[in-house]
C-alpha cells in the first residue's frame, strides 16, 4: 500500500511539471521579485528599538510576495532556452542566499534585548520577525529544490550548460544545489537516456567540494554508493572518503541500539570505509592523493577501533562539542504557553561524549523527553535527522563547556520523570551534588539549568529574561490540564538571549506544509487557552485511564503497573499525567489527522486519472477517499486542469483549509461555548 510519506515527497514535483501559465502573472514586471526581496530586507528591524508592533504585518506581507514571486519564476513560463533557465535559477539562488543572510543578521540582534530595561513587547515582535524569516527560508528552500531539479533535467543533455549549473551552485555555495547536482557523481541509472554526455571526473571532484563546503549531509548515501562501486576511479574513491570526513562520518550504533529495529543503522561505518579505502592501491594514485589516502586510513583506523579521537564531531559545516546546547524547532502544543512567544525553539538537548561498553567514544545528545522513565542518549546525527530547524549554543570558555558536558554525561540512564508543572526548584537542589543513581525530575529546558548551574556563573547569565504563563485564561486553563508554569520557568527559546552563549552552528530551515497544518492546530490550542474556557472532553478510554490513575494513588501495585504501561517515571503524578495525556492524544489526533488529509487532498487534485491508481497499488478504499476529496475541492481541481492554478496557490489553499478545519475541531473538543 503506498505510504502517505511517499505522497508528501511526490506531490511537489508533480505540481511543478503539471502547472501551466496564468496571464495575470505573465504580464507583471520582471524585476518585481528582486524588488520585493529588497523591500523585505528594508522592512526588517535592524535594532531592538525598531521592533514595534507596526513592523510585523508589512513584514509578513513582503514575505508572502517574495514567496509568490519565487513560485511564479519557478514556473519558467516563456523560458525555452537552457541558458535562460540557468539565469532564472541564479536569481532564485541569490534571493535564497539573501534571505539566509537576513536570518543571520536577525540572530545577531538577540543580545540587544537584554541591554537596559527588558521590553517583552519588543522581544515578542522580534520573535515574530524571526519566526517569519525561518518560515520563508524554509519555503524558499523547498521551492528552490524543485526549481534546480527542473533546471538539471532541462540541461542534462548539454554538457556545457550542465557545467554552468554546477558553477552556479558552487558560486552561491548552495546546499540545495549540492543536493541536486550530487546525483552527477554517480553513473547514470539504467533508465536514463543513452545519449547523455558523460560527467568528467574533474566535475565530480568539484561537486564533492561543493557538498563539503555546503555541509550537505543528505549526500552521504550517494557518497557511500560511489565508494562501494568497484567501477569508480580510485582517485574519486579517495576524495569521496575525504568528503565524508568533511561533512561527518556517521558514528557506529551505540551497543544498546544494536539489534533495535526502531534505530536506523548508519549509512556507512568507519570499518566499511576503511576496508574499501584500504583496497585502493597507493601505487595507482598520484603522490598527493596517495598521501591523502594514508592520512584517511590512519583516521579511519582509529575511528573504527576507538570512536571519536578528539572532543568534536563534524555535523555538516560545523563541529559539535561536549557541553553544547541543542535547540530544536518542530510543531509543538507548548510553543505559545509563555509570555516569551512565539517560541523559536520547542525542545532542547545537551551534547556530551559517551564512552560505550564497546570502548568507543561517541558524541551523543542527552535530553529529557515527556514520555519515558530514564534519561536517554542518542548519537547526535541520528537525533537531529527529522528536525525542521536546529541550532547549537556554546559557551566559549572550554572549562565551563566541559563542566556542562560532564554533567549531562553523568545522568545518562538515570531514572527520570517529566515535571508537568515545569518547575526548576528540584534541579536547584541538585547543585554541586553527585548524580550517580539520582532520579531527575524536571522538564526539557530544566536539563539546561542542571548543567549550567555547575559553572561559576549565575543563572541570569544563561537565562536573562524571566518568563511567566501567557496572559488571559492560560494559567487557569492549564490547571485543568494538570499543567502549570512553575516559578522561575525557563523555555527552550529563553536561553537564546544569553550574553554568555554563542551560536556554534545552525542549519538553514526546512519547510513541510504538513507541519504548517499541525502548527496551526497547536497554536490555536494555545490561543484558546488564553482567550476561551477550556472544557476537556476525553473519550471513554481516556476517562477510564484518569479514573484508574486516581485509584492507583492508594494502590502501589497498580501504580507501578500503570507506570510501566504508560512508560512514565516514578516521580510523575499519575493523575496529572493521565489528564495531560488525554488532551495531548486528542491534540495529536486532530493535528496529524488534518495534516494527513492535506496530503491526500493535494494528491487527489494532482494525480490524474483515479481509475489507474489500483494498478499502482492503491486500495479501493483509498481511491474512493481520493474521489471524495477531489469532489470537496472541485474548484481547485478544475483550475488545476485548466492550468490556471500555481503549485504554491494550491498548497496555500489546502493548508489554510485543513488548518482551519483542525481549529474548528479543536473548538468542538475543548472550547465549546458556555
Residue spans of the language-model regions?
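Bacterial N-terminal signal peptides that target proteins for export
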Residues: 1-11
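Bacterial N-terminal signal peptides
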Residues: 9-20
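Cysteine-nucleophile amide-bond enzymes
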Residues: 26-674
Amino acid at each position: 500500500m503506498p505510504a502517505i510519506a511517499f505522497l508528501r515527497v511526490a506531490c511537489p514535483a508533480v505540481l511543478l511539471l503539471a502547472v501551466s501559465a496564468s496571464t495575470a502573472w505573465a504580464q507583471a514586471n520582471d524585476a518585481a521579485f528582486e524588488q520585493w526581496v529588497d523591500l523585505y530586507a528594508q522592512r526588517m528591524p535592524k535594532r531592538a528599538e525598531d521592533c514595534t508592533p507596526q513592523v510585523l504585518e508589512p513584514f509578513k506581507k513582503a514575505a508572502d510576495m517574495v514567496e509568490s514571486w519565487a513560485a511564479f519564476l519557478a514556473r519558467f513560463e516563456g523560458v525555452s532556452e537552457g541558458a535562460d533557465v540557468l539565469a532564472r535559477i541564479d536569481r532564485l539562488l541569490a534571493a535564497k542566499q539573501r534571505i539566509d543572510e537576513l536570518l543571520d543578521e536577525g540572530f545577531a540582534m538577540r543580545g540587544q534585548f537584554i541591554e537596559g530595561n527588558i521590553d517583552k513587547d519588543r522581544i515578542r515582535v522580534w520573535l515574530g520577525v524571526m519566526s517569519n524569516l525561518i518560515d520563508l527560508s524554509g519555503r524558499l528552500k523547498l521551492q528552490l529544490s524543485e526549481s534546480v531539479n527542473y533546471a538539471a533535467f532541462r540541461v542534462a543533455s548539454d554538457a556545457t550548460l550542465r557545467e554552468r549549473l554546477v558553477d552556479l551552485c558552487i558560486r552561491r555555495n548552495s546546499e540545495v544545489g549540492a543536493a541536486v547536482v550530487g546525483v552527477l557523481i554517480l553513473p547514470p541509472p539504467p533508465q536514463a537516456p543513452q545519449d547523455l554526455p558523460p560527467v568528467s571526473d574533474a566535475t565530480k571532484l568539484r561537486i564533492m567540494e561543493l557538498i563539503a563546503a555546503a555541509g550537505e549531509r543528505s549526500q552521504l548515501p550517494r557518497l557511500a554508493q560511489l565508494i562501494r562501486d568497484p567501477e569508480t576511479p580510485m582517485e574519486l574513491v579517495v576524495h569521496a572518503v575525504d568528503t565524508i570526513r568533511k561533512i561527518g562520518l556517521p558514528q557506529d550504533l551505540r551497543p544498546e541500539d544494536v539489534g533495535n529495529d526502531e534505530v536506523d543503522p548508519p549509512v556507512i561505518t568507519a570499518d566499511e570505509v576503511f576496508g574499501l579505502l584500504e583496497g585502493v592501491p597507493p601505487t595507482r594514485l598520484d603522490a598527493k592523493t596517495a598521501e591523502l589516502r594514508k592520512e584517511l586510513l590512519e583516521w579511519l583506523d582509529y575511528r573504527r577501533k576507538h570512536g571519536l579521537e578528539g572532543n568534536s564531531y563534524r555535523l555538516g559545516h560545523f563541529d559539535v562539542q561536549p557541553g553544547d546546547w541543542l535547540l530544536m524547532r518542530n510543531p509543538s502544543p507548548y510553543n505559545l504557553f509563555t509570555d516569551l512567544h512565539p517560541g523559536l525553539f520547542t525542545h532542547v538537548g545537551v551534547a556530551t561524549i559517551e564512552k560505550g561498553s564497546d570502548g568507543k567514544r561517541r558524541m551523543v545528545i542527552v535530553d529529557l523527553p515527556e514520555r519515558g522513565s530514564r534519561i536517554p542518549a542518542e548519537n547526535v546525527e541520528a537525533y537531529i535527522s527529522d528536525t525542521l530547524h536546529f541550532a547549537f549554543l556554546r559557551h566559549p570558555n572550554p572549562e565551563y563547556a566541559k563542566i556542562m558536558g560532564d554533567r549531562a554525561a553523568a545522568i545518562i540512564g538515570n531514572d527520570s520523570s517529566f515535571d508537568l508543572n515545569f518547575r526548576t526548584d528540584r534541579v536547584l537542589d541538585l547543585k554541586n551534588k553527585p548524580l550517580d543513581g539520582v532520579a531527575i525530575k524536571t522538564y526539557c529546558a530544566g536539563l539546561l539549568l542542571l548543567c549550567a548551574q555547575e559553572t561559576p556563573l549565575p543563572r541570569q547569565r544563561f537565562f536573562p529574561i524571566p518568563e511567566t504563563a501567557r496572559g488571559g485564561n492560560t494559567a487557569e486553563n492549564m490547571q485543568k490540564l494538570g499543567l502549570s508554569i512553575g516559578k522561575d520557568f525557563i523555555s527552550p527559546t529563553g536561553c537564546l538571549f544569553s550574553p554568555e552563549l554563542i551560536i556554534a552552528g545552525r542549519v538553514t530551515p526546512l519547510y513541510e506544509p504538513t507541519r504548517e497544518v499541525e502548527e496551526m492546530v497547536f497554536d490555536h490550542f494555545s490561543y484558546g487557552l488564553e482567550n476561551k474556557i477550556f472544557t476537556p472532553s476525553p473519550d471513554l478510554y481516556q476517562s477510564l485511564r484518569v479514573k484508574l490513575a486516581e485509584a492507583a494513588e492508594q494502590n502501589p501495585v497498580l501504580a507501578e503497573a500503570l507506570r510501566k504501561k504508560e512508560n512514565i517515571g516514578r516521580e510523575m503524578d499519575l493523575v496529572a499525567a493521565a489528564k495531560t495525556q488525554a488532551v495531548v492524544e486528542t491534540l495529536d489526533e486532530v493535528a496529524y489527522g488534518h495534516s494527513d488529509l492535506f496530503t491526500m487532498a493535494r494528491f487527489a487534485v494532482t494525480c490524474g486519472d483515479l481509475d489507474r491508481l489500483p494498478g499502482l497499488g492503491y486500495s479501493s478504499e483509498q481511491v474512493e477517499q481520493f474521489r471524495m476529496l477531489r469532489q470537496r475541492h472541485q474548484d481547485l481541481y478544475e483550475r488545476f486542469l485548466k492550468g490556471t492554478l500555481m503549485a504554491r496557490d494550491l498548497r496555500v489553499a489546502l493548508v489554510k483549509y485543513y488548518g482551519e478545519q483542525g481549529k474548528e475541531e479543536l473548538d468542538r473538543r475543548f472550547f465549546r461555548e458556555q
